[in-house]
Swiss-Prot record:
Gene name of this polypeptide: ycf4
Protein name, per record: Photosystem I assembly protein Ycf4
Annotated membrane topology: Multi-pass membrane protein
Organism phylogeny: Eukaryota, Viridiplantae, Streptophyta, Embryophyta, Tracheophyta
Family classification: Belongs to the Ycf4 family.
Source organism (scientific name): Drimys granadensis
Keyword Cell inner membrane applies: no
GO annotation (BP), single: photosynthesis
Length: 184
């Protein structure tokens, strides 16, 4: 969702609360829970899951390995659920032509740097840079080149934008900020 007028442009950034992250967290949780239950069933010698006959799985070495994979999967799943609940990566980009200021805000992991807030003047923006890598793992990322600060990404690296979408976004950003576009 974006909001735009002649002088102010606010672009909301979606963080980790995406449908794909919810799906992966659920799949990983259920799969690792199944592994842990089968490993525990082989240790106890009775079925905790009626779908799988776990008496056929001996505890050493198959049951231990399945329990290990189940515990590891639960840790990774809890990490995913934490990033979803904290909404890591969400925020906004605000371009204010009236005050001549650009503000970039993102939520991070809990701690000292939970709130990431960057603020700089529009006159320090040198260009909008488009980085395009084609191939098996194609990548299209839009950067804002800032004098003395380097390049700050405006799009996420996991966003699969089409060439037309990235060009349109680069053109809109460059037009609003009145800076040139560079392509790498």
């Amino acid at each position: 969702m974006n909001w735009r007028s002649e002088r102010i442009w606010i672009e909301l950034i979606t963080g980790s609360r995406k449908i794909s992250n919810f799906c992966w967290a659920c799949i990983l949780f259920l799969g690792s829970l199944g592994f842990l239950l089968v490993g525990t069933s082989s240790y106890l010698g009775r079925n905790l899951i009626s779908l799988f006959p776990s008496q056929q799985i001996i505890f050493f070495p198959q049951g231990i390995v399945m329990s290990f994979y189940g515990i590891a999967g639960l840790f990774i799943s809890s990490y995913l659920w934490c990033t979803i609940s904290w909404n890591v990566g969400s925020g906004y980009d605000r371009f204010d032509r009236k005050e001549g200021v650009v503000c970039i805000f993102r939520w991070g992991f809990p701690g000292i740097n939970r709130r990431i807030f960057l603020r700089f003047l529009m006159r320090d923006i040198q260009s909008i840079r488009m980085e395009v890598k084609e191939g098996l793992y194609s990548r299209r990322v839009l950067y804002m080149e800032i004098r003395g600060q380097g390049a700050i990404p405006l799009t996420r690296t996991d966003e699969n934008l089409t060439p037309r979408e990235i060009e349109q976004k680069a053109a809109e950003s460059a037009y609003f900020l009145r800076v040139p576009i560079e392509v790498f």
